[in-house]
Structures are given as C-alpha cells and as structure tokens.
C-alpha cells in the first residue's frame, strides 16, 4: 500500500516542492479503492523533531501495516493493486520479505505519464549475514534491491547497526538528521573516512513521523558524482529519498533514487514507494540480523 502525490513542479532552488495526500480508504469485499485528496505542502531544509515541518506529511503512508492485507506464506510475497491519483490509476506492486520482516510498494504502471516500469530484482532478499556490504567494515549491508535500467531507478533495502553518531540508546530521542548522518556515513564502498563520505552527500530535508507507535525517519539527499568529459552536468548527481526504522538494535533503511534531472517526473512515484515502507511483525521465516552476523552461507 503506498501514498501518492502529484508531479513536482520545476525547482527554483536546491529544495523541491511537493504535495502531500490525505488518504481515506474504502473496502468493498475483496476489492479495494484508495481515494486521494490533495493538499499543498512545501519543503524547507532540515527540520527539527521539536517542531513539525510542513513536509512531515509528504512521506507518511497508511498507519496499518501491509501484513494485514497480504498473505505471508512464503519468505517473499509480491502483490498488485491499483491506486487512483487525480483520475489516473497507478498500479503498484507490493514486496513482502519475511526473511527480514519488512514490506514496501513499488510502481508498475503509470498511464498518465505513459510509463511502464521494467523492474529487475538485482538482489533477491537474503539474510543480513550473507548480504553484500556497503562499507569496508561490513556494518551496513544491502539485503535486497530492484532496478529499472530503462528509467534509471533503484530501490534498495539496507540493514546495519547505528554508529557513534547516535549517542543515545533511546531511539525516540534521535533526530532525523542524526539518523541520516549515521546511515550516510556508513554508506560507501570507498575506503575513506566517514566525514569524507558525508561530504559526498547533501541532505535536503529530514523529519520524523510516528507510525503505530514507532518512529520512522525520512530524509531526502543528493549524492554528487565525479564529473567526466562525457558526463552532462545534470547527470553528476543522484537524487535519493529514504526512510529508516529501528528494530532489535539495527537500522532498516529503504533507499529510492534516480538521476537528478529526472526527479520532477520520477520523484513523486519514488516518494510513494518510500512512504509505504513498514517493518512487519516477524514470522517463522524471520532471521534477525544479530543471528550469526558473520555467517556467509
């Protein structure tokens, strides 16, 4: 289940404007229809959890977890549903990973933009211990990933313990900016210091939301790329949007990204995917990341 918002207008600065959606759902037997009512919300830079940002509603999905509506008979479940947005149907697929106990929705078909997404599972869901590391110390690991090479889209899930930037043991005291810095400082395959890795990224917005009594931290950022003679200026960075939640001492993060020049078109769709991310109640298939974390088979 995902939250939708209309296309973003052209940016007039490094921050981008977005519209949030107020959602009411109606269920008739086995069929479901999500009715979307739009209301305008604009971004600002880093927002504090002490004062709610107007952007706080942009990425919030429905409070009920997807597991209420989806069968969990296998470690990975895929489902489809149609979501109406401004009279157009956006078909969403739903991915449920029982191994790591999370779910999210991803776009399949967007008629108003004449888009048919061509997703490939570049990394099928796997336990934390056998997942590919995103940093030299192997703390942060990518447990699943899907890509659309045609539209240059990537949606991935990573898991890793908090680093020293999160000094408090009480997660409800963490700010979204602190969580973003913790994740981004670990997110690199380069052998550089954490401060250098942070310099590669520019956080545009960060805020937190409480969903079912648990904090979810949302942040939007750019990752700069090294310029080359053949690269156009608009391709020198990727635009990311992420959501992080904590369970059992580990941070679970969904990352969705595209090229910076495509953000106006693809950003609203990726925001729906990130807004739908939820940690699910563990099933018998769940393998906690602290179980044999260095077992690679």
Curated annotation (Swiss-Prot):
Keywords carried by this UniProt record: Chloroplast, Plastid, Thylakoid, Transit peptide
Coiled coil residues, start to end: none
InterPro entries registered for this protein in UniProt: Mog1/PsbP_a/b/a-sand, PsbP_C
Function field: Involved in strigolactone biosynthesis.
Protein family: Belongs to the PsbP family.
GO cellular component: chloroplast; chloroplast thylakoid lumen; chloroplast thylakoid membrane; extrinsic component of membrane; photosystem II oxygen evolving complex; plasma membrane; thylakoid; thylakoid lumen
GO annotation (BP), single: photosynthesis
Traits of the deletion mutant: Smaller plants and frequent morphological defects, including increased lateral root branching, aerial rosettes and multiple rosettes. No effect on photosystem II and linear photosynthetic electron transfer.
Alphabetical list of Pfam families matching this protein: PsbP (PF01789)
Name of the gene encoding the protein in the UniProt record: PPD5
Keyword Transferase: no
Domain of life: Eukaryota
GO MF entries: calcium ion binding
Compartment(s) where it occurs, according to its Swiss-Prot or TrEMBL record: Plastid, Chloroplast thylakoid lumen
Stored Gene3D superfamilies: Mog1/PsbP, alpha/beta/alpha sandwich
Descriptive protein name: PsbP domain-containing protein 5, chloroplastic
């Amino acid at each position: 289940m995902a939250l939708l918002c209309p296309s973003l207008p052209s940016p007039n600065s490094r921050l981008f404007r977005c519209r949030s959606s107020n959602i009411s759902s109606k269920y008739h037997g086995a069929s479901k229809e999500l009715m979307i009512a739009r209301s305008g919300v604009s971004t600002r830079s880093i927002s504090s959890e002490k004062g709610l940002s107007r952007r706080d509603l942009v990425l919030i999905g429905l409070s009920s977890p997807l597991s209420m509506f989806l069968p969990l008979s296998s470690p990975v479940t895929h489902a489809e549903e149609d979501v109406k947005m401004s009279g157009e149907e956006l078909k969403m697929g739903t991915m449920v990973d029982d191994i790591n106990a999370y779910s999210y929705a991803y776009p399949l078909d967007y008629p108003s933009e004449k888009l048919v997404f061509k997703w490939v599972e570049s990394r099928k869901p796997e336990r934390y211990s056998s997942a590919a590391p995103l940093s030299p110390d192997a703390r942060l690991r990518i447990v699943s990933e899907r890509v659309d090479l045609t539209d240059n889209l990537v949606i991935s899930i990573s898991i890793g313990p908090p680093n020293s930037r999160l000094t408090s043991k009480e997660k409800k005291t963490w700010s979204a900016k602190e969580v973003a810095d913790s994740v981004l400082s670990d997110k690199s395959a380069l052998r550089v210091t954490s401060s250098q890795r942070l310099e590669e990224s520019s956080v545009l917005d960060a805020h937190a939301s409480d969903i079912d009594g648990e904090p979810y931290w949302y942040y939007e950022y750019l990752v700069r790329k090294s310029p080359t003679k053949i690269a156009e200026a608009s391709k020198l960075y990727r635009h990311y949007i992420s959501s992080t939640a904590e369970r059992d001492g580990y941070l679970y993060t969904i990352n969705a990204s595209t090229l910076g020049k495509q953000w106006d078109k693809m950003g609203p769709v990726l925001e729906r995917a990130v807004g739908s991310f939820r940690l699910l109640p563990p099933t018998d298939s769940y393998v906690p990341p602290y179980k044999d974390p260095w077992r690679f088979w």
